[in-house]
Structures are given as C-alpha cells and as structure tokens.
Amino acid sequence: MIAYKLVRRGRDGNLYPLFIDRNRPYVFGEHRIAEYIPTKGFAPRLGFHCCFTPYAPHLKQNLKSGEKRVWIECDIDDFKTYPRPPSQGGEWILAQKLTAMRVISQDEVKKLNNDI
C-alpha cells in the first residue's frame, strides 16, 4: 500500500527519520523492517509512522534551526492504524515493513491533499 512519511533532509543530502533512529538514512528501494528503539520522551509505538496523505499539521516542514523536511512516498506492508486527533492529521499508520520510493514535490503534496 502507498503511504507518506515526513523525513529530514540532512546537510549531506540524505533523508533521515524525524525522531526515532534519526541517524540511519532512508535509501530508496531498500526494504526495512521496524525495530523497537526506545527513545526518551517518545511513546513506545513499534512501527514506521506514516500517513494516508502527506498531511501532518502538527509537524513543521522548515524549522528555525534550518532543518528542512520533505515528504516521501513509501510502499508499506503489515500495518495497523492508530487514531489521532485532527490537529495531528487524523489517523496514523504504524507499518512494520517500509520501502522508501521517492521524494514528492510540494506541488504533489498540495494536489494529494486537495484530492481528499
């Protein structure tokens, strides 16, 4: 199933998770299996956090620190949904298997979000 994930674009140009296992880059085409990585300050929710659409209003895309975030399209499998309030984008996906496929442009993000 296609899903969307917000990631950090590192200074080296690689794409990294926002919070958990944040130093391991995503590689397009690489199949990843979720691992439990305890991280202080975060609830223990095993799985790659993804969205049905590229919409997460509680997460900024351009931070004051200069960090840039972009949406990637992913192929996911073995997932469950996790209910969240509309202010956090509604339902989240917790996927056990993820393959990062490509960065989606801001124009694509707008179109995908207008289509819902």
Give the ranges of each region predicted by the language model.
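ADP-ribose/NAD+-binding catalytic cleft of ART/PARP-like enzymes
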Residues: M1-R45, Q61-K68, K80
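Intrinsically disordered, low-complexity, compositionally biased regions/tails
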Residues: P17, I33, C51, I93-L94
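Catalytic toxin/effector domains delivered as secreted proteins or via bacterial secretion systems
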Residues: F42-C50, P54-P57
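Charge-dense polyanion-binding interfaces
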Residues: L63-I104
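Mixed-charge (acidic/basic) macromolecular-recognition segments
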Residues: A95, Q106-I116
